[in-house]
Amino acid sequence: IAVEPDSCPSLTRGTYTYDSGDTAGLTPQLMMYTLGRDFIPPIIHAGGLRYHGASPLVSALVHHGLVEAQSVGDEEVYQAASLFLETEGILAAPESSHAIAQTIRAAVVAREEERHEVILFNLSGHGLYDLAFYDRMIPARVARQSVPL
């Protein structure tokens, strides 16, 4: 499953067509899922996923039905990253946290359907350079851990 942010859904809502790989239109045309090179994505926590198109290779896999594409929202990504940090002690990059969110979705479905599955995901980077992403989660964690006086 290829996972992307809801705010930049090239695989799930884009068009499979030739488009430029850059916003200036200087690169060769690439066959990919794209929102159009004129699409200006919002500023999001996962800068590496803030792009108008998807990889031509991943796009071809999705187009031919070999890979499924899903999108996840920011809040679900924050919750998944926080849970992963608290349970596994690993500070995942925001981009990787999209995969973690989708993995949690798949695990919940498997549990509800009483299926035992092996679910793998790619943790492609740490979040040590993305501490601002985690700062957004701290108030929620502190609120959960505080003891009323």
Feature roles, as predicted:
Residues 2-90, 94, 136-149:
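Active-site/ligand-binding loops adjacent to catalytic centers
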Residues 3, 17, 102-149:
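Catalytic phosphate/nucleotide-handling subdomain of diverse soluble enzymes
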Residues 7, 98, 128:
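Short, glycine/acidic-enriched loop or turn micro-motifs at the edges of active sites
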Residues 91-103:
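Substrate-binding/catalytic subdomain of NAD(P)-dependent oxidoreductase enzymes
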